[in-house]
């Protein structure tokens, strides 16, 4: 596809998408508003395009997928994926807290149980991806191919445990404090404030205030985290990808054995 792009294609794409109706300008720091608006109008006020802004109404739906790709390396890299939450889903902060506890760092359950206690993986973690109309929750691990079955077994055990019983409220509280602290520290950077404000306006239609984010994080309970984990970690909708040394492993069979 990319090889087929030529100068005319790129130029047409630019003309179609890059114009005033499609731009968000975000400014942060030491400036005078009227002076800044004057300068922006001077530089960009005459920038006209005939093509109107087009809001695409297509909806991206999660599709169960299984992908395997052999590569000439010693390790195997595996991702297990579940339908996640959209960017504006009311439980997105509950999922963020769950992800932090489950696989979001070196103190998470996945890292401690599978890498530290059992020494089975080179790396293991989870993360969330959110878009306007869909999302994905992903677990990633890299390991010696001989350890794959045991790693799948332990991941399955962890999934069962975290969807069977809520995390202690004290642990939830500590995680929320950590998330809020990281968020506040991030807002101390002028560059971060500028980027966050612009992205919020572009993607949400308004600038999300710091106090709003903090309040929504603080409002999450252990019951919210458990309910969200149960909703997201639907093993009937699990997808997987495996890349690397695939010899000796039937990944479809392993997924069926431990997650179905």
Region roles according to the model:
Residues 113:
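Catalytic cores of enzymes that engage adenine nucleotides and/or redox cofactors via long glycine-rich
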Residues 52-109:
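His/Glu-based metal-binding/catalytic segments typifying zinc-dependent metallopeptidases
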Residues 1-52, 68, 85-86, 94, ...:
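Charge-rich, well-structured scaffold segments of protease-associated domains
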């Amino acid at each position: 596809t990319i090889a087929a792009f030529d100068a005319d294609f790129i130029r047409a794409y630019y003309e179609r998408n890059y114009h005033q109706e499609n731009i968000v300008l975000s400014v942060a720091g030491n400036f005078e508003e009227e002076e800044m608006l004057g300068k922006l109008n001077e530089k960009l006020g005459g920038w006209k395009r005939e093509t109107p802004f087009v809001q695409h109404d297509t909806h991206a739906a999660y599709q169960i997928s299984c992908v395997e790709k052999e590569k000439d390396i010693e390790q195997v890299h595996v991702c297990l994926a579940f339908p996640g939450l959209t960017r504006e889903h009311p439980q997105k902060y509950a999922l963020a807290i769950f992800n932090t506890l489950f696989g979001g760092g070196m103190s998470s359950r996945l890292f401690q149980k599978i890498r530290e206690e059992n020494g089975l993986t080179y790396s293991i973690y989870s993360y969330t991806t959110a878009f306007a109309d869909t999302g994905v929750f992903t677990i990633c691990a890299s390991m010696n191919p001989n350890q794959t079955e045991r790693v799948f077994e332990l991941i399955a055990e962890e999934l069962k445990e975290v969807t069977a019983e809520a995390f202690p409220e004290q642990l939830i509280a500590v995680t929320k404090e950590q998330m809020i602290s990281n968020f506040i520290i991030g807002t101390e950077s002028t560059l971060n404030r500028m980027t966050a404000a612009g992205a919020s306006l572009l993607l949400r239609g308004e600038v999300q205030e710091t106090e709003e984010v903090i309040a929504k994080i603080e409002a999450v309970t252990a019951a919210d985290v458990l309910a969200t984990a149960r909703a997201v970690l639907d093993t009937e909708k699990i997808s997987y990808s495996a890349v690397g040394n695939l010899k000796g492993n039937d990944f479809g069979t392993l997924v069926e054995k431990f997650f179905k």
